[in-house]
Amino acid sequence: MNIPKDPVMLVSFLNLKLRDQYASLNALCDDLELNPEEITQKTASIDYHYKPEYNQFL
């Protein structure tokens, strides 16, 4: 799946998917065939980190 390359847009995309469709980052990555380590590196570049207790990047 094509996902946004811009980190800000990526966080918005991920949080929307996590809120509406997926119970966890791993479920999202498994379904969309994404590497969770790559995702978290990209979001960390703008100081957003996955918080499992909220199921969001904050």
For the regions a language model picked out, list residue spans one by one.
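N-terminal acidic leader/helix
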Residues: 1-20, 24
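Short alpha-helical "recognition helix" segments of helix-turn-helix
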Residues: 28-29
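Short acidic, Pro/Gly- and aromatic-enriched capping/linker segments at domain boundaries
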Residues: 35-48
